[in-house]
């Protein structure tokens, strides 16, 4: 008997646990937080009766809407109390209106400062223009009118900042100013690079290194600066000078001779060189690249018979009387230049008269010719031929 009870005890214990679990499950299902009925049908009937009761006393609304209305009412009461408190301490206004008023004040203050600054700049600009007119009373009328138009335009621009067309014009003017400044900077940089290149390359001679000895509509004669002034590399060439000749078609360089040895080189074009001697004359046809040497004192002239191409040549001048100094004697310009090389006795014997008379008649005329040359009254050295 005892053995039978012991063998059945675990089974009874398991059945008891299952029974308790089922009772607890049924109890939990029938009770929801201890507030609603056990049966779903009873809960539904209770809800319907509650709604009918609320409808009799007033309009019915769900519970969550009532809670939202209560919160909104609390916020409204708090806002009204805050407004009353602000009214007691001073003039009241909504917070967003206060912020807008502050922004409006800042904007108005900024506009006033900007207008004051523009008026100040305009006044200063007009005063400077007035001072310039007083300092420069001889200015042209159109320059004064341009200044006045510029002042009016700036005034109109300051008054019409909000005009789209005015803003477009201002933007165009600023872009043009920036473009001009950029071009100016590029020009300056190019000039600096050119100068640096010239310093790096002493063998490069620009056109501004030449001195114009003669120029007219038919051509020019130019003298290059001394080589030793260009660089220390040319110190041994201080006794050498370079002369450039240019002549248009159908022109002639009038006869002359120079107190220096010449090495003539044709750079472009064709020429006929005629060399005069006491008993004869010789002519040479020269083309590009031809070179010829003329001794000091040789009288010669050049002709450009080409119909289209200009004649351009250079002379390497080697003075014989002084280092780096030479003089050209032009027969057509001043015949009395030849008298400089003769002494007083030779002149008296040649002209069979007193030196004072020779000096008065010939040398004074030579001095007048020299003064006329200094004043720019040069006789043509290059003339047109038919």
From Swiss-Prot:
Subcellular location(s) per record: Vacuole, Aleurone grain; Vacuole
Organism for this UniProt entry: Pisum sativum (Garden pea)
SMART domains hit by this protein: Cupin_1 (SM00835)
Gene: CVCB
Any one GO MF annotation of this record: nutrient reservoir activity
Name of the protein this chain belongs to: Convicilin
Signal peptide positions (record): 1-29
GO cellular component labels: aleurone grain; vacuole
Role, per record: Seed storage protein.
Composition bias type Basic and acidic residues, residue spans: 41-65, 74-91, 104-144, 153-186
Annotated region described as Disordered, given as residue ranges: 33-199, 367-386
Keywords, in A-Z order: Seed storage protein, Signal, Storage protein, Vacuole
Cupin type-1 domain span: 202-359
Main location: other
Keyword check for Transport: no
Family of the protein in this entry: Belongs to the 7S seed storage protein family.
């Amino acid at each position: 008997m005892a053995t039978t009870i012991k063998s059945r005890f675990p089974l009874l214990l398991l059945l008891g646990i299952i029974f308790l679990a089922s009772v607890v499950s049924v109890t939990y299902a029938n009770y929801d937080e201890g507030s609603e009925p056990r049966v779903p049908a009873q809960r539904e009937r209770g809800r319907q009766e509650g709604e009918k009761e609320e409808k009799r006393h007033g309009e019915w609304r769900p519970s969550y809407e009532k809670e939202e209305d209560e919160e909104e009412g609390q916020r409204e009461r708090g806002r009204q109390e805050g407004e009353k408190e602000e009214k007691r301490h001073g003039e009241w206004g909504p917070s967003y209106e206060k912020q807008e008023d502050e922004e409006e004040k800042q904007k108005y203050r900024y506009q006033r400062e900007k207008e004051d600054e523009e008026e100040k700049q305009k006044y200063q600009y007009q005063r400077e223009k007035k001072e310039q007119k007083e300092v420069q009373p001889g200015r042209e009328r159109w320059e004064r009118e341009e200044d006045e138009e510029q002042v009016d335009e700036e005034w109109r621009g300051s008054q019409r900042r909000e005009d789209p067309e005015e803003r477009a014009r201002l933007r165009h003017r600023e872009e043009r100013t920036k473009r001009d400044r950029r071009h100016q900077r590029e020009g300056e940089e190019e000039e600096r690079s050119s100068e640096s290149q010239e310093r790096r390359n002493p063998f490069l001679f620009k056109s501004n290194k030449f001195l114009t000895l003669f120029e007219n509509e038919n051509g020019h004669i130019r003298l290059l600066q001394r080589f030793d002034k260009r660089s220390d590399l040319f110190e041994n060439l201080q006794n050498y000078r370079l002369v450039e000749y240019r002549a248009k078609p159908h022109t002639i360089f009038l006869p002359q001779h120079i107190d220096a040895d010449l090495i003539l080189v044709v750079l472009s074009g064709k020429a006929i060189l005629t060399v005069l001697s006491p008993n004869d004359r010789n002519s040479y046809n020269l083309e590009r690249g031809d070179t010829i040497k003329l001794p000091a004192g040789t009288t010669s002239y050049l002709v450009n018979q080409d119909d289209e191409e200009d004649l351009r040549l250079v002379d390497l001048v080697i003075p014989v009387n002084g280092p780096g100094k030479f003089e050209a004697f032009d027969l057509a310009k001043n015949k009395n230049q030849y008298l400089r090389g003769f002494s007083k006795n030779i002149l008296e014997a040649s002209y069979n008269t007193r030196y004072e008379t020779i000096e008065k008649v010939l040398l004074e005329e030579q001095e007048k010719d020299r003064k006329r040359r200094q004043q720019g009254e040069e006789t043509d050295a290059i003339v047109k031929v038919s």
